[in-house]
Design a protein with these regions (language model features):
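Short, conserved active-site loops that position catalytic residues or coordinate cofactors/metal ions
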Residues: 39-41
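Short hydrophobic/aromatic beta-strand micro-patches
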Residues: 44-46
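Conserved H-loop
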Residues: 29
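Catalytic core of pol beta-like nucleotidyltransferases
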Residues: 1-23, 32-37, 48-104
Length: 104
């Protein structure tokens, strides 16, 4: 299990490497308080605007180097979040419903 100090550090790193106004949300098993022995961390990073979400995800994932855990970093623009937040079954809906904000 990954301790809260490490999770908070990851949130700070992701927020610090992102544009102003970015929100970092932890979701998945750690946010629900149900991590298993092999659980990774799942982050939704909501940026004001995103040109290429895949490239930004890779760039942000690199900021977590040195923290010894597996992580998924999903990047979405504020507009994409608005478009998908009410669509049940979507990743964005689930992340917002179960997640907790680490950094804003």
């Amino acid at each position: 299990m990954i301790d809260e100090a490490t999770i908070d550090e990851a949130g700070r790193r992701l927020a610090g490497a992102s544009p102003p106004g970015t929100r970092v949300i932890l979701f998945g098993s750690h946010a629900r308080g149900e991590p298993g022995k092999h659980s990774d961390l799942d982050f939704l990073v909501i940026e004001p605007e995103v040109e290429n979400a895949a490239e930004e995800s890779v760039r942000l994932r690199r900021t977590l180097r040195g923290l010894l855990f597996a992580a998924d970093v999903i990047v979405a623009s504020e507009q994409r979040v608005r478009d998908w937040r009410d669509v049940k079954g979507s990743l964005i809906h689930a992340a917002l419903a179960e997640g907790r904000e680490l950094a804003a």
